[in-house]
């Protein structure tokens, strides 16, 4: 028997009564000792500086709404926590919900005005879209497809680090898909651009929503074909082959990057394959 999803997205009517709500400001999401969801009626009594409200779905059957604040404010007994911290710890279903909420918030903030004429937009009832009446344009949440690939050579894996990474951490190669390009073409191009290596036997492994701010990560495994590593200037601080028994600090456990690495380690050792987060 299939288990129902704890979190499901939906476009809910903000005029409806009741339900729960999550609250986002420039400091992250509101949190207390019970979590990041609050009774909607209780929040209404706090006189929060709400910029917009959105019905985003159901968590364990309860309707959930998003309140986007104009600025962060102090709420007694509560604190603000960034989205990445929710990813690293706690209930992963809650992170999935907040990740969706963050993307809705980004979309609503970036599409308050039409990009064609500059006029104010309105949210379409029953649809996740903003509308410009003047240009008859519907503006939907942005999703940016990107690839991430683990390149392997026997008992070695190719890992790299960006100057933006946490000190010492290495990860799989990644990059955004260009217009007119397939995900597979993107993998070959990005690997060549970033490390000057050719790959073969490309295999799709799975995908993960990456709401920082709106990526869809498409995960791949590839085998090394030819070429010596030459890191791309300014983009890649270091790249090298690591033996699977001597790896550097790796990405967070709940990331698709970590899954690709753990899946290959399991394959080499004969251990059970890990589960892709999300």
UniProtKB/Swiss-Prot annotation:
Coiled coil: none annotated. The keyword Kinase does not apply. Residues 141-264 form the Nudix hydrolase domain. CDD domains: NUDIX_NADH_pyrophosphatase_Nudt13. InterPro entries: NAD-cap_RNA_hydrolase_NudC (IPR050241), NADH_PPase-like_N (IPR015375), NudC-like_C (IPR049734), NUDIX_hydrolase-like_dom_sf (IPR015797), NUDIX_hydrolase_dom (IPR000086), RNA_Hydrolase_NudC (IPR022925), Znr_NADH_PPase (IPR015376). GO terms for molecular function: magnesium ion binding; manganese ion binding; NAD+ diphosphatase activity; NADH pyrophosphatase activity; RNA NAD-cap (NMN-forming) hydrolase activity; zinc ion binding. Zn(2+) binds at residues 114, 117, 132. A divalent metal cation 1 binds at residues 174, 194, 235. Divalent metal cations. Mg(2+) or Mn(2+). Its EC number is 3.6.1.-, 3.6.1.22. GO terms for cellular component: cytosol. A divalent metal cation 2 binds at residue 190. A divalent metal cation 3 binds at residues 190, 194, 235. Keywords: Hydrolase, Magnesium, Manganese, Metal-binding, NAD, Zinc. GO terms for biological process: NAD catabolic process; NADH metabolic process; NADP catabolic process. Substrate binds at residues 84, 127, 140, 208-215, 257. Its cofactor is Mg(2+); Mn(2+); Zn(2+). mRNA decapping enzyme that specifically removes the nicotinamide adenine dinucleotide (NAD) cap from a subset of mRNAs by hydrolyzing the diphosphate linkage to produce nicotinamide mononucleotide (NMN) and 5' monophosphate mRNA. The NAD-cap is present at the 5'-end of some mRNAs and stabilizes RNA against 5'-processing. Has preference for mRNAs with a 5'-end purine. Catalyzes the hydrolysis of a broad range of dinucleotide pyrophosphates. Belongs to the Nudix hydrolase family. NudC subfamily. Homodimer. PANTHER family: NAD-CAPPED RNA HYDROLASE NUDT12 (PTHR42904:SF6), NUDIX HYDROLASE, NUDC SUBFAMILY (PTHR42904). This is NAD-capped RNA hydrolase NudC. It comes from Pseudomonas savastanoi pv. phaseolicola (strain 1448A / Race 6).
């Amino acid at each position: 028997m299939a288990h129902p999803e704890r979190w499901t997205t939906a476009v809910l009517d903000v005029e409806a009564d009741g339900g729960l709500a999550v609250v986002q400001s420039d400091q992250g999401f509101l949190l207390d000792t019970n979590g990041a969801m609050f009774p909607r009626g209780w929040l209404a009594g706090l006189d929060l500086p709400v910029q917009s409200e959105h019905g985003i779905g159901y968590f364990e059957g309860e309707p959930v709404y998003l309140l986007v604040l104009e600025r962060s404010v102090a709420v007694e007994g509560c604190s603000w926590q960034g989205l990445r911290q929710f990813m690293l710890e706690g209930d992963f279903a809650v992170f999935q919900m907040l990740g969706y909420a963050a993307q809705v918030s980004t979309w609503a903030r970036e599409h308050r005005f039409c990009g064609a004429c500059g006029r104010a937009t309105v949210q379409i009832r029953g649809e996740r879209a903003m509308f410009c009446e003047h240009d008859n344009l519907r503006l939907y949440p942005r999703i940016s497809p990107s690839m991430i690939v683990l390149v392997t050579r026997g008992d070695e894996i190719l890992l790299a680090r960006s100057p933006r990474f946490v000190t010492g951490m290495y990860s799989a190669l990644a990059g955004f898909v260009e217009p007119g390009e397939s995900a597979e073409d993107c993998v070959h191009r990005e690997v060549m651009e970033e490390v000057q290596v050719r790959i073969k036997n490309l295999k799709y492994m799975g995908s993960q929503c990456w709401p920082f701010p709106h990526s869809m990560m498409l995960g791949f495994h590839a085998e090394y074909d030819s070429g010596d590593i030459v890191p791309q200037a300014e983009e890649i601080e270091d790249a090298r082959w690591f033996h699977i028994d001597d790896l550097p600090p790796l990405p967070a456990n709940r990331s698709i990057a970590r899954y690709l690495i753990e899946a290959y380690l399991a394959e080499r050792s004969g251990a059970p394959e890990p589960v892709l987060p999300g």
